[in-house]
A protein has these predicted regions:
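Single-stranded RNA-binding surfaces
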Residues: 1-159
């Protein structure tokens, strides 16, 4: 069986078709609004640390900075950051995530200022869309949802199909 993914990007919408043996299996259309939807993944930059809240604000390109709490960094934050640094150092080379090493978990009672610094780049995923005057809410525990499984890199403790 051969699978083919066809993506058509137009000024007002994006269409995606999944073909298996030249037969349409799945079709999706989305408007090209610049909305920040739940599940979107961005490379953000730390704008401001808030030690009193144990959180920080991250610039992901939205008009308001997004909010990232220390507990939303996830236990494998150091592993994510090491892998991200590797990828960003040489963007032309492929770094399979299967070859990435797992580092010790971050301290559950730790402080945001001990882990992050202003200007640092972090890979984040939106968990709550922006509302009113507030920007989006973020997490560093990335998850990729598929039809039969949810992939969470560096998280091998739970595997369900």
């Amino acid at each position: 069986m051969t699978s083919e993914l066809v993506v058509d990007v137009q000024p007002k919408e994006v269409s995606i078709a999944l073909l298996e043996d030249k037969n349409l299996v799945e079709f999706q259309q989305e408007g090209r609004s610049a909305s920040f939807a739940v599940g979107n993944i961005y490379l953000g930059r730390i704008k401001k640390l808030m030690p009193g809240l144990n959180a920080c604000f991250v610039d992901v390109g939205y008009e308001r900075d997004a909010f990232l709490h220390y507990l939303d960094l996830g236990p494998q934050f150091h592993s994510y950051q090491k892998y991200l640094k590797q990828v960003l150092s040489d963007r032309k080379k492929l770094y399979p995530i299967s070859k990435a090493t797992s580092l010790p978990d971050i301290d559950k009672e730790g402080s945001i200022s001990n882990v992050l610094q202003t200007g640092q780049e972090v890979m984040v995923q939106i968990v709550k869309e922006p509302i009113s005057t507030k920007g989006p809410r973020l997490t560093c525990e990335l998850s990729f949802a598929g039809r039969y499984l949810v992939l969470m890199p560096f998280n091998l403790s739970l595997i369900h199909i």
